[in-house]
Amino acid sequence: MNTPFQPLQKWFANNAGVMQGAAAPLLVVAILSMMVLPLPPLLLDMFFTVNIAVALMVMMVAAYMIRPLDFAAFPSVLLLTTLMRLSLNVASTRVVLLEGHTGPGAAGAVIEAFGHFLIGGNFAVGLIVFSILVVINFVVVTKGAERIAEVSARFTLDAMPGKQMAVDADLNAGLIDEKEAKRRRAEVGEEAEFFGSMDGASKFVRGDAVAGILILLITIFGGFAIGMLQHDLSASQAANTYILLAVGDALVAQIPGLLISVAAAMVV
């Protein structure tokens, strides 16, 4: 029985490979478009929730994998999650600066919850908590993971010729067949490529931590200026409104960033 959707189903079936190949570029374009397009608070809430859920899933996968090549796509995942966090930071900063004077719920329920529930509505406490999280993420986890990735890449590349010679020796001795030798050579190459990629990808995590600090400072000073000059708010009103929203926004981005940093440290 023919249905109105049958031609569409055939088109999807015939172009499945093309669509799979285009999925990653389209995802990158969609993430980067969040930096440019204004997002309503409801969409921000959804994207922040997805961001936290993805960070948790990545950390759980990193915790339970047996060897690094089990998660060979991790450098790409690291790039995409970093881009998503930065895009959400830019989008939420835009909403905070444009609509912050209307009240604490201007940037959505998630930022409001982080600003009121986690730090008790006190922006000074929020700044202290954010500073502690930045120290943990930037100084402890990220710096250690970056050094581990650098050393792992160096030692893996140095050991690569020896591993390939060992495979050739086992093949010549008859301990393995040609098929197993090809598999082992491919595994050695993939391992070297993975650790080399992780050495570069760890810089994304470090840069993301620095960007979080700068975005928070820009949002605070920009919010003060907009609140006092454009909306005639007093200094205390501007502080209570914009700093609370800025700190809530920073915490929403910093917690997934910390989870991804821990995952990167586990992988390498």
Spell out what each predicted region is.
Residues 16-18, 60, 248-250:
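Short amphipathic alpha-helical surface micro-motifs
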Residues 47, 85, 148, 201, ...:
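Residue-level signature of catalytic and energy-coupling elements of molecular machines
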Residues 21-28, 36-52, 72-82, 116-143, ...:
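Hydrophobic alpha-helical transmembrane segments
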Residues 29-31, 50-64:
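Central hydrophobic cores of alpha-helical transmembrane segments in multi-pass inner-membrane proteins
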Residues 1-34, 41:
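Generic start-of-chain signal for non-secretory N-termini
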Residues 2-13, 44, 59-80, 90-115, ...:
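Juxtamembrane helix-loop transition segments at the membrane interface in multi-pass membrane proteins
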